[in-house]
Amino acid sequence: RRLRPEAIVEAKKELGFAYEWVATPVSKAKKDLLDRFPELTDAVGAETRDGLTLVRFGLFNLTKEIVTKNQFKHPIKIRFPADTMILSARFGEALKMERKSTAEPVVNESLVLIPAESMNPRSTLIYNLILRGNAVPDSVIGEIEGKGHIDRVH
């Protein structure tokens, strides 16, 4: 008796809620990236831009369902090393959805709190961070009711 192919295919893990970030030193940023950070002049002013890093932090609803803001157990917490100075944290853009909230991230020393927002299936919210110092987060913590902990996209 032969096994049917579908009998040996493992069930795929359902995609969930995830994040990813990309850090680019200002000195290496191309015009199209700089254009996505109109707040750069306000955040830095006449100060030197040496050592500044632009971070695009994306939240992804990879499920086939709407995730409501009430499903967030708490705001997404992005913790940077203590010596990292967070000069700005702002909403950047929404993909595959219309953003209904005007809430902005909150900065508390080396911590950025991303506010809970409803997200459409397969949608993305991108936040712009301007940092001086180490741009690699120590941790990213978040949990969505019914979806579990937020994971980094690999």
Please report, for each region that a protein language model flagged, where it lies by residue.
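Proline/serine/threonine-rich low-complexity linkers at boundaries of modular beta-sandwich domains
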Residues: K12, A23-L33
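Extended, hydrophilic extramembrane loops/domains of integral membrane proteins
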Residues: E117-H154
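Asparagine-centered strand-capping/turn motif at beta-strand->loop junctions
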Residues: L59-F72, F80
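Solvent-exposed beta-hairpin/edge-strand motifs
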Residues: F72-K96
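Short, well-ordered beta-strand segments enriched in hydrophobic/aromatic residues
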Residues: T53-N61, R122
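Hydrophobic, helix-forming membrane-interacting segments
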Residues: R1-V22
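Extracellular adhesion/glycan-binding regions together with long Ser/Thr-
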Residues: R99-S123
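Short, solvent-exposed beta-strand/turn "edge" segments of beta-rich domains on protein surfaces
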Residues: A29-L54, E65-N70, S118
